């Protein structure tokens, strides 16, 4: 396994500090990561801005910093805008993923992470499923033409559960369409994510990690002089302080064939604030967690066989 720092963590998307891409590359190196996961949108690796010259310069910076191009993160929703069928949203997104595949290869990588789709009332589940399977299948075929791999993340509504996710990958049925299987999603669903990891490990090429605690919420009802339980708020915390057993999750993946990239992201408001110092503290804590539990070599990454 090798580690990557997700650039979205320093994008300012949730009110946190924002850094340009070149500074994140250097930060990933300084904080002890093997590579970087680049957000395929502004303010980072947007196709609108990644000219041939910018690509060449970024690849040189990564080489100088000894940082690998671990994954290019695409942002897709293949069920979007059911109200306006005349707009070719899926075609535009397939083209977007195709060009991200070219960008990933230009930067020295192969993996492009994508999402499925969100459910919406105007599109029946079976129709949404078929449309998304078809779109991802075409993305995979076009990515294969340029030497890239599509990695579907269990993030959006469609195929969010681990069983549905496995069914989805089987429905796509393309050799270069693999899994970017994460623990946090099944953990929030109260799914058995350790068992799921064992099932999905052979297809998993990438996983993204963030740790959370549950914050209980109650709403006061004066007519009852009592409280009603609401859904918990999920709060991001430093690695190892949350309720997800990431040591067990990574072991389950590796025991069953995974040897890919483990990325760390800060993709929601953090418990300790949004300053650059806090972002660095969280990113450093993840690198320390990996070194505390797995033996490491620069050439081979983190080894399960020498778990500490």
Show which residues each predicted segment covers.
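N-terminal small/glycine-rich loop or linker at the start of catalytic domains
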Residues: 1-12, 70-83, 116-119
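Conserved beta-strand positions in the central sheet of alpha/beta enzyme cores
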Residues: 37, 71, 113, 151, ...
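Glycine-rich, proline-tolerant flexible connector loops at the mouths of alpha/beta enzymes
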Residues: 37-59, 117-123
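Short, small-residue-enriched loops and turns at beta-alpha junctions
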Residues: 44-46, 79-80, 119-121, 156-159, ...
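Histidine-acidic metal/acid-base catalytic patches
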Residues: 1-32, 108, 159-181, 185-308
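Short, conserved active-site loops that position catalytic residues or coordinate cofactors/metal ions
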Residues: 31-42, 71-76
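Active-site acidic/histidine proton-transfer and metal-coordination neighborhood
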Residues: 22-26, 61-68, 80-179, 304
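The substrate-binding groove and active-site-proximal loops of carbohydrate-active enzymes
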Residues: 44, 83-91, 236-240
């Amino acid at each position: 396994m090798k580690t990557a720092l997700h650039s979205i963590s320093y994008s300012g998307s949730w009110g946190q500090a924002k850094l340009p891409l070149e500074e994140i590359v250097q930060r990933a190196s300084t904080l002890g990561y093997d590579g970087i996961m680049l957000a395929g949108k502004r303010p980072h690796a947007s196709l609108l801005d990644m000219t041939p010259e910018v690509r060449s310069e970024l690849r040189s910076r990564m080489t100088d910093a000894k940082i690998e191009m671990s994954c290019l993160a695409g942002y897709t929703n293949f069920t979007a805008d059911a109200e306006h069928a005349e707009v070719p949203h899926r075609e535009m997104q397939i083209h977007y993923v195709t060009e991200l595949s070219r960008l990933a290869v230009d930067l020295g990588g192969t993996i492009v992470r994508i999402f499925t789709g969100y459910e919406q009332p105007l599109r029946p589940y079976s129709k949404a499923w078929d449309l998304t399977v078809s779109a991802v299948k075409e993305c995979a075929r076009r990515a294969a033409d340029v030497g890239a791999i599509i990695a579907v993340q269990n993030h959006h509504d469609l195929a969010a559960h681990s069983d549905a996710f496995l069914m989805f990958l089987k429905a796509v049925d393309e050799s270069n369409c693999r899994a970017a299987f994460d623990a946090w999603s099944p953990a929030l669903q109260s799914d058995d994510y350790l068992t799921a990891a064992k099932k999905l490990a052979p297809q998993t090429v990438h996983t993204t990690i963030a740790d959370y605690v549950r914050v209980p919420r109650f709403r006061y009802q004066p007519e009852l002089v009592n409280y009603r339980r609401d859904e918990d708020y999920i709060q991001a915390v430093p690695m190892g302080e949350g309720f997800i057993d990431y040591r067990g999750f990574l072991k389950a993946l590796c025991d069953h064939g995974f040897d890919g990239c483990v990325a760390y992201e800060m993709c929601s408001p953090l418990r300790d604030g949004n300053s650059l110092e806090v972002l660095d503290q969280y990113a450093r804590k993840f690198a320390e967690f990996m070194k505390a539990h797995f033996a490491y070599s620069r050439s081979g990454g983190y080894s399960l066989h020498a778990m500490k």
